[in-house]
Amino acid sequence: MAKTFSILGDSISTFDGWNPPGFDVFYSDERLEKTGVTHVEQTWWHLLIDHFGGTLLKNDSFSGSLVEGGFFPAGDSDARADAILGNEGEAPDAIVCFIGINDYGWGGAKMNADGHGSACPAELSAQAPVEKVLAELAAPGQIERFKTAYASMLARLRARCPETEIWRVTLVPGRIAGHAKPQFAYDFRGVPFAEYNDAIRAAAHEAGAHVADAFACGMDYEAIEGTHPTARGMRQLAGMFAWSMEHETEIDAALGRGARELATVPQSMLPAELLSEWEDATLWRSAPLCADKPCSFCEHAMAPNNAWLLMCGNA
């Protein structure tokens, strides 16, 4: 496995003092105590790099960022692609990309701009209405825009790092700490969660990049509000990422390389060491709660006045 790693991500992958100057960071100040992630060694990316015996070159993660957007701080922007390189312009041996949950939560770059998202590119904010608008459904064609942006992001990285091993990690559902049942909203704005992961896989396969299909593990990770991992959730993510990177071929053999929707591997394929991060792995298997309507229309939405919160209050 690679010696030097760079990370491209959103808030889940930030940590105070470890991201480029001026980048928004989630894991800082009082949030460190709230999540229990008080030391950088507890982050998923530090744990993953340690697992492979590597070192961090650059953590190019910006809190709140989407893939789509075309301008900084979107993942699909020249500035983010430039930030993946070392201070001397050197390319890493491997890039691990874990980004896209904000695209799912907002329903796209335009909705992020209209909702006055904190990480919206200035070029898009300038076109947004003065008053905040929180639309319930993603605009038609959202998954195609996401896949196009994801492929463009990959092309920007490849142009700067032609010899680098690039890993695309699929999105993983979270669960609030202490909750005994699945809570994740699998159809938040009318575009199913599975379609985002299928788009990630397709874009990666078409570009010849690796896919770490962490979703295929079939597990929820622990988070303070369902999105941002606790210290335990960080260990769970790191374990799922490492296992899916090491077993890419076996996952493809079990599930195929086409659209997987919500397919996961049998829990018997997962090693005991990985499952030990859940006190009862059977209870932490992820599953959709219902298929009645998009979650943003539902009376059980946990934060209807929030821009987004991907949890169901009826679970």
Label every model-predicted segment:
Residues 3, 84-86, 198, 206, ...:
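Viral virion structural and adsorption modules
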Residues 4, 15-129, 135, 140-144, ...:
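Conserved SGNH/GDSL esterase-like catalytic core that processes O-acyl groups on lipids
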Residues 8-9, 169:
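Short hydrophobic segments within beta-strands
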Residues 62, 100, 170-173, 215-216:
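Short, well-ordered beta-to-alpha junction loops that form the rim of enzyme active sites
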Residues 81, 150-154, 197:
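Generic structural signal for well-ordered alpha-helices
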Residues 156, 173-214, 240:
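Substrate-gating cap/lid alpha-helix
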Residues 161-165:
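A short helix->loop->beta-strand "cap" motif at the edges of active sites that frequently abuts
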Residues 192-193, 224-274:
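Histidine-centered active-site loop/cap adjacent to the catalytic His
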